[in-house]
A protein has these predicted regions:
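Sec-dependent signal peptide recognition
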Residues: 1-7
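Aromatic- and Gly/Pro-enriched helix-to-coil junctions and flexible linker segments
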Residues: 9-128
Length: 128
């Protein structure tokens, strides 16, 4: 019995956030145009604490170097293993679904069942 309690109380090591999964699944969402909203990179490449690299004119994707810089920035807004505590997922999530009250770029997801939200949550949980 004590062993089970010990295991339950033992701190869990958070999953490692994977760069390749970020580049394949997360970064495209930051570049995607959504109806009624600007692409994340439009606002987040200037004047915000969550600062992404500007996308070079005429480019549809980032270089590996720029992706690594973005990955390092995005990790600051994520609590690995805890999507429900990660600002990357909470800021653009509707308040009624557990998101923050305000996101200057609007609310991108109405529920946690949104496929984009699930993609991000999977990555935060260590998905590859």
């Amino acid at each position: 019995m004590w062993f089970i309690v010990f295991l339950l109380l033992w701190p869990q090591t958070p999953p490692e956030l994977d760069f390749n999964a970020y580049r394949a699944h997360v970064e495209p969402l930051l570049l995607e145009k959504r109806p009624g909203h600007a692409r994340c990179v439009v606002c987040h490449s200037t004047g915000t604490a969550f600062r992404l690299q500007p996308l070079p004119k005429g480019q549809a994707a980032y270089s590996e170097e720029a992706s690594r810089k973005n990955f390092d920035m995005v990790k600051k807004f994520v609590r690995a293993g805890h999507p429900d505590e990660s600002r990357l997922l909470l800021m653009p999530l509707a308040h009624e679904a557990g998101g923050t009250e305000f996101h200057p770029g609007g609310k991108h997801w109405e529920t946690r069942d949104d496929p984009e939200w699930k993609t991000l949550a999977d990555w935060v949980n260590g998905g590859r």
